[in-house]
Design a protein with these regions (language model features):
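Cytosolic regulatory regions of ion transport systems
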Residues: 1-161
Length: 161
């Protein structure tokens, strides 16, 4: 699968996982994995490779995902057990960057403890971004840096023109 592009594995093809796999496939080589045949069939023509597997099974996962992957994204938020086991397995395989979707702060803490390099809360992050844009119509975009610090792209008010 290697062509000089980043090699990314996306595990879990629900709403978030399928969207990120499609976006990444435009610039990276994507291996998309899910236990649902229906979900895999919906994306098979839009990524470089899509397979039906149970990511909780170390033997199966390690036969497909090798340490030469640049990154893995675990989007199994609806099943805490599956996301924790999958993250642990990816760490054992030797994946250096593992981004895992979490549903609670405790879930995120466990994911980090077993090997996730970053935990993500897509719904929370989208809600924060939308709320900031609604509260400040001049806000074009922002990047949170830390708890109380952000880089913001703000349009000047009309009175500045």
């Amino acid at each position: 699968m290697r062509s000089g592009q980043k090699l990314i594995c996306v595990i879990g093809l629900g709403q978030f996982g399928s969207h990120i796999a499609r976006e990444l496939a435009q610039h990276c080589e994507v291996l998309a994995l899910d236990s649902s045949e229906k979900r895999v069939n919906l994306i098979v023509d839009e990524v470089q490779r899509a397979l039906i597997i149970d990511a909780r099974d170390f033997q199966t996962l390690s036969s497909l995902v090798t340490p030469d992957f640049d990154e893995a994204i675990v989007s199994l938020g609806e099943s805490m057990e599956a996301s924790i086991l999958c993250t642990l397995h990816l760490k054992r395989i030797g994946i250096k960057t593992i981004r895992a979707k979490a549903v609670t702060e405790d879930h995120a803490a466990i994911l980090r403890a077993v090997g996730a390099t970053e935990t993500i809360f897509p719904e929370r992050e989208t809600a924060q971004r939308l709320a900031a844009q609604i509260a400040n119509p001049n806000l074009l975009d922002f990047i949170p840096l830390a708890e109380d610090f952000r880089v913001m792209d703000v349009a000047p008010p009309d009175s500045f023109h």
